[in-house]
Design a protein with these regions (language model features):
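Non-catalytic structural scaffold of enzyme domains
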Residues: 1-216
């Protein structure tokens, strides 16, 4: 079986490769990476017609590979993928969809912590829309650790972790469950030893959903 993944950063690639190897080792991964997508979203603060056009192109390319599922890795371009996935002839999945479903099942007050401003709205909207589909009422609070991803990309992992952990602690005090909007925050989980509320990240939940969707 085959899954085509559309990435906006190489940062996520190794983690997802490891998760696929662990959870669905029989699945072939094909990766499409365009790091200009995320930069364009960050620059404009929202998706643009050019981003939508490129995402459509990548889904078309993915279709030629005859995959069993097309996987969107980046929350910031989720709205573009929602448009592009309509032309897919196979199953599709956004990395944060399973996480949003789990968050809604765990509580009515949900904190969304993001390290990229352009991800805050799409991630929050996804939680709200998921709750609506499931017939639940939720209150979503947003927490932006502005610039933290840039700090991580520059190599200062400790500073990135410190900033994000402080924001997670704040979100924990005000919510039933905390959602981490960037998959790049997954490495922080082992450091959250004094956090008692559920803290959810998307990569593992998404790959577990891939397994379910493919019937493996």
């Amino acid at each position: 079986m085959k899954v085509v993944l559309i990435h906006t950063s190489p940062v996520s690639l190794n983690e997802l490769k490891a998760l696929f190897k662990e959870i669905v080792p029989e699945v072939e991964m094909v990766n499409i990476i365009d790091d200009s997508l995320l930069e364009e979203v960050k620059k404009n603060g929202h998706i643009t017609p050019a981003i939508i056009s490129r995402m459509n192109s990548y889904v078309q390319v993915a279709k030629t590979l005859e995959p069993d599922l097309i996987f969107n890795q980046c929350s910031s371009v989720g709205e573009a993928f929602d448009l592009a996935r309509k032309q897919a002839t196979c199953k599709t999945l956004k990395i944060d969809e399973p996480m949003a479903e789990k968050a809604v099942s765990l509580g009515s007050k949900i904190g969304v912590v993001a390290t990229v401003a352009s991800t805050v709205q799409p991630s929050s909207d996804l939680v709200r829309n998921t709750a609506k589909k499931l017939g639940k009422e939720v209150e979503v609070k947003e927490y932006l650790v502005d610039g933290a991803l840039d700090i991580l990309m520059s190599g200062d992992v400790d500073k990135h972790n410190e900033l994000v952990i402080n924001e997670i602690k704040k979100a924990e005090e005000e919510n039933d469950v905390v959602v981490l909007a960037q998959g790049s925050m997954t490495a922080i989980l082992p450091l959250l030893t004094d956090i008692r509320k559920p803290v959810l990240t998307s990569p593992r939940l998404a790959v577990e959903r891939v397994k379910k969707e493919l019937g493996l």
